[in-house]
C-alpha cells in the first residue's frame, strides 16, 4: 500500500520559496495509522499533543528589517491531520522575505494556516532567543535505563511481546531512554529520540522496556505513530492507573517534533534536551 506521504515533498527535490505561501503545507490524515492500531477518532484511549519547535524562523518588519524567533507549535493529538515535516519547513521558509506588521500579526497568521492544515486549533508561541536561552538544557527526572545489559536479536518491527511486568507490585515511576530510533517511512532517514515513560501501575521490567524500544531501530513510521504504538502496548500490558509516553526527537531541518500521549489532560514540559 502506498504511504499517504508519497505525494508530499518528502524525498523530492524542492524549490525554496521566499514569499509567504500557505499552500505549501501538506496535511496527512491520521485515520489510516489510527486504523492500523485498531483506533478511530471516536475511540482514542489517550489525550495529548505534538509539540513542534522551530529554530529557523525569520521574517521582515514593514521597514524591511529581519526578525528572528523560536516558534512553538502545539497540534492536538486528536486533530484529523498531522502536517508533513518537509512541507512545514518549506512553509516556514516562505516567511523569510515576507513583511508582517508585528510579531502578533505573524503569530495570528501561523495559527490560522496551521489550524487549517491540522483540522483543529493549533497553539502558537513565538519566543525570543533570550527567553529560550534562559531555560537552559533540560535534565530528565527518573531513571535512565540505557546502561542495562540486554541481548538484542531483532530490529525490524516493534516487539511488544518483549515487555514484562510484575503484576503483584504497584509502583509509580518515570523511566527514560535515549536509545529510541526509528526511520522515516518515505526517505528511510533515521529519527533519533529520547523516550520517557511515566506511569502508576504494575512494575514494568526496565530491561524489557529497553529491549522493546530497541526493536524500533529499523521500524519505519512517523514520530507520532511510534509514540502511539508504544503507549498502546504499555497500556495493554500494564492496565495502569496513570500513564504518559513522551518522545523528544532530535531536530531535522530546523524542526524538532515531540509527541506526548497520556491518560490525563496534562501539558508536558517543552524544555529542550541536550541533543535538541
From Swiss-Prot:
Positions with a binding annotation for substrate: 83-85, 223-224
Reaction(s) catalysed by this chain's protein: 7-aminomethyl-7-carbaguanine + 2 NADP(+) = 7-cyano-7-deazaguanine + 2 NADPH + 3 H(+)
Assigned keywords, A-Z: Cytoplasm, NADP, Oxidoreductase, Queuosine biosynthesis
Pathway the protein acts in: tRNA modification; tRNA-queuosine biosynthesis
Active site (catalytic residues): 184 (thioimide intermediate), 191 (proton donor)
EC number: 1.7.1.13
Record-listed NADPH binding positions: 85-86, 252-253
SUPFAM superfamilies: Tetrahydrobiopterin biosynthesis enzymes-like
GO cellular component terms, A-Z: cytoplasm
Compartment annotation: Cytoplasm
A GO MF label: preQ1 synthase activity
Annotated GO biological process: queuosine biosynthetic process; tRNA modification
Superkingdom of the organism of origin: Bacteria
Keyword Cytoplasm attached: yes
The UniProt record lists the keyword Repressor: no
One Pfam family it belongs to: QueF
Family the entry assigns: Belongs to the GTP cyclohydrolase I family. QueF type 2 subfamily.
Oligomer and partners: Homodimer.
Function, as annotated: Catalyzes the NADPH-dependent reduction of 7-cyano-7-deazaguanine (preQ0) to 7-aminomethyl-7-deazaguanine (preQ1).
The protein, known as: NADPH-dependent 7-cyano-7-deazaguanine reductase
